Amino acid sequence: MGRDLPIETADQRHTWLSGTLRRGFAWAGDLIVPPVCAACRGALSSHHTLCAACWRDVGFIRAPLCDRLGIPLPFDTGGPTVSAAALADPPDYDRARAATYFAGTAQRLVHGFKYSDRQELRVLLGAWMQAAGHDLLDDAHLIVPVPMNRRRLFWRTFNQAAILAHEIGRRTGLPVSVSALRRRRATMPQVGLTRAQRRVNMEGAFGVAKRKRHLIDGHNILLIDDVITTGATINACARVLLRAGAARVDVLTVAMVAGEVPLTP
């Protein structure tokens, strides 16, 4: 009898059965691992989200924004606007966007993701990044994460930027290359260095793999990292990608440190 069903009826039955199974598995999963707030771990009704109190503590970066640096502007001009800071000291990348400021709940989430191996946070953080970078994602051809120093990668066992890159790729269907950009050497901590010292510190730290150069040449690259701090790392990566022939390089992160972007001499 089942073989004689009209196609539409069979499809409807398959959709109903699939939905029922998904809901059943979700219900069973919630019994085993009840949903909690991603930040404070308080009880919630669904996974991968925040309670009201933690949500209010997130400093989302909202428009109007400087088209280059992604920092808030005092008023909306009705179109793309470049801040005085970006005009005075243009970044090497084309545009940067961050979902939040690196403080409060957002800082706790990023630290949990990076240092406590809470890789499930990629879902929530990826959703924030997708919303913040929708205009960059529309123009991107390839997603490239900021690479990690081999020694640090050995001890941490994962590159948080690569995990975020794959999450954004999963959400958008854009291709991801974790090996196109390589870390050639370790660098000194950037804290306390002037802009000139930061640039020297990062020079030669990154390179494009020869066998991946064809993925970069002539394409719009979306560079992914977790946090923009001093901006020196993403600028160094952008310079290398542009030298390899990238048509443009945009930057998308979870957060930025307030007061650190733009760079100051």
Predicted regions and their residues:
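Glycine-rich phosphate/pyrophosphate-handling loop used in enzymes and phosphotransfer proteins
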Residues: 1-225, 229-265
